[in-house]
């Protein structure tokens, strides 16, 4: 189904992602993000409400075992359209071909006359097509407009019991430490939700590239590519489990990433979806290029650590990718199946570029990484605010509420390459 412009409660999908991220879900689950990502769109919502039900009186010093957590995958490009806009319009332009010369009389490669532009009695273009039109022939830009709309919303909250906590602790300092611990842990919950949102945005994009491979050719089976290059027939299990094979595979992987990074700088039709537009019998294609400083690379970190001695000097230098445009992940979707993804993505309808549909389920066991244009994956922060209630006069507690509204955006017309092992 298409993503709609009304706010969508994304609590369930965010919470499911948090449970997978933290190992609460014992195995990887299929995540349906078909109405989560705006293609242009995507977003998540989550917010468990935690209430302190019981408190224990302490006889000694209390230690607050809480430390601040920082969300992963902050490499994703972020924008801020604000609360009063839930649609982003993106306009690109199709490539237009060169035109025939009007400055010469021309022939084709067989010697046959194409256009006679200079001849006695000929005027500007009014010669039955024998000459080219006048200089006033129009050649307007051919635009492509996409709207990335929608809003995913969720709240979070925490309750602080003021009198009870003051009774439970021996001093204002202990009370302050306890309240601070509550707030830090709630902040950690919010950071986990933020990470879940970012992770879901990334997972939808990765699965979408695979699902659209027939039109973008951007999902590369590195096992098949390695075997084709080396003239071997190793399986993924053999490569990952045999040190000699793995060392050679890593060298091939680094080489491949360097080549692909160079290819993305070329203005071409490769590695993205180009919805063809036909005007007057002429087909127009959308060409893209991604300079080095606009490329981002996310890799499965344990594989990258094995390859680090080679990858660092070979890939990350001023001539290739900048290190700040790289991030490693310890797992893609579930800590218990770190290299796997299982997603039903939201993708554009290639038969109707104005529509968004649910794609086919994508289940891959060994994903290595994704190399992409920074504009291909974005998170639109529309609202992020918090408010505190007054103290409840009878029961002496207060609530703090957080409100979130975001939109996750995947643009498959921008360059992006998925690297996996089949």
What are these language model-derived features?
Residues 5-12, 43-46, 50, 54, ...:
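Alpha-helix boundary/N-cap detector
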